[in-house]
Curated annotation (Swiss-Prot):
Residues 143-167 are annotated as: Disordered. The lineage of its organism: Eukaryota, Metazoa, Chordata, Craniata, Vertebrata. Gene3D superfamilies: Geminin coiled-coil domain. Keywords: Cell cycle, Coiled coil, DNA replication, Nucleus, Phosphoprotein. GO terms for cellular component: extracellular region; nucleus. Regulator of DNA replication. Promotes initiation of chromosomal DNA replication by mediating TOPBP1- and CDK2-dependent recruitment of CDC45L onto replication origins. It is found in: Nucleus. It comes from the Eukaryota. This is Geminin coiled-coil domain-containing protein 1. GO terms for biological process: cerebrospinal fluid circulation; cilium assembly; DNA replication; multi-ciliated epithelial cell differentiation; multicellular organism growth; negative regulation of cell cycle; regulation of DNA-templated DNA replication initiation; seminiferous tubule development. GO terms for molecular function: chromatin binding. Belongs to the GEMC1 family.
Length: 334
């Protein structure tokens, strides 16, 4: 069977030139093609034509995809650069840690040499001797016993300190030591003088002058009881005399006033001599809880003197130029 194979057939090559491996002209004697050979060759030509047609379509679909090739390369380069930078940081950290480790090893070697030195061994021997001694054990035992005791057990009830009252008690002890013993003053004396105590004036109450206001005749009759003696102004006590708490009595001075002059003698003493303070007297029928006699006289425009007479003595209260009060107590002397 003689056959001519058309190599330019478009069914085999898709419309393109195709180099046929066989010659275009054959003879029966040179080529013998069976039916099976013809079918296999025809199927191979069909497959080659399909592959050539699918290749341009694949290139077009790849070019039309959502990830273009230049953008993909730039993203990969950015990821690679970040990884390289991270790797460089880790390498620097590793170098620093290695240097620090080497320094620690060196310090450790120096410490070992110091511990193996003779000085440290000598100190260890001394410490062992001290710990093994009996004195240290006794002292440590006392310290442990003292530490177990509470603060309440360390002090007795009388020895427990009171920081709040310590200063107050100390000041009271000093005050008791500084005070001098003296006879007490009756409360009615202080009330009559208008004083709270010997050093404080009571501004709320005034001196008791009820005896002078309610019994003028009694005062006048007292002057008339002594007609023979005269008043000695030179011997009258002065305001600057010191206070004497002795309980002695003295004989009173007497006045030359008569019963007919009545109470006018007090009005005549408006401007007495400077040394005049009081006119003492004594009556047995006057109660000791009341003022026997008291009067006020002005020695100067800015100085007032008030005098009070009692069985125990005489009291003088004077206001000075600064506005304060001065108190003087003169007991009776025998």
């Amino acid at each position: 069977m003689n056959t001519i194979l058309p190599c330019q057939d478009q069914y085999f090559v898709g419309g393109q030139s195709y180099n046929c491996p066989y010659s275009t002209t054959t003879s029966e004697s040179s080529v013998d093609v069976s039916t099976e050979t013809w079918v296999s060759f025809w199927a191979a030509g069909l497959l080659d034509n399909r592959e050539l047609q699918q290749a341009p379509q694949a290139q077009e679909s790849f070019s039309d995809s959502n990830f273009p090739l230049p953008d993909l390369c730039s993203w990969e380069e950015a990821q690679l650069s970040s990884q390289l930078y991270r790797n460089k940081q880790l390498q620097d950290t590793l170098v620093q840690k290695e240097e620090e480790l080497a320094r620690l090893h060196e310090e450790n070697n120096h410490l070992r040499q110091y511990l193996n030195s003779a000085l440290v061994k000598c100190l260890e021997e001394k410490a062992k001797k001290l710990l093994s001694s009996d004195e240290f054990s006794k002292a440590y035992g006392k310290f442990r016993k003292g530490k177990r005791k509470s603060k309440e057990q360390r002090y007795s009830p009388a020895e427990i300190p009171h920081p709040k009252n310590a200063k107050r008690n100390l000041s009271s002890e000093f005050a008791n030591c500084e005070e001098q013993a003296g006879p007490p003053v009756d409360p009615w004396v202080l009330q009559t003088l208008g004083l709270k105590d010997l050093d404080t004036i009571d501004d709320t109450s005034s001196a008791n002058y009820s005896a002078l206001a309610s019994h003028p005749r009694r005062v006048a009759s007292t002057f008339s009881q002594f007609p023979d003696d005269a008043v000695d102004y030179k011997n009258i006590p002065r305001e600057d005399m010191p206070i004497d708490y002795r309980g002695d009595r003295t004989t009173p001075l007497h006045s030359t006033a008569t019963h007919g002059e009545d109470f006018h003698i007090l009005s005549q003493l408006s401007n007495p001599p400077v040394g005049l303070k009081t006119l003492p007297y004594y009556t047995a029928h006057v109660s000791p809880n009341k003022t026997e006699m008291a009067f006020s006289t002005s020695l100067s425009p800015h100085c007032n003197v008030k005098t009070h007479s009692f069985h125990q003595g005489q009291a003088f209260v004077r206001r000075d130029e600064e506005g304060g009060w001065k108190f003087t107590w003169v007991p009776k002397q025998s």
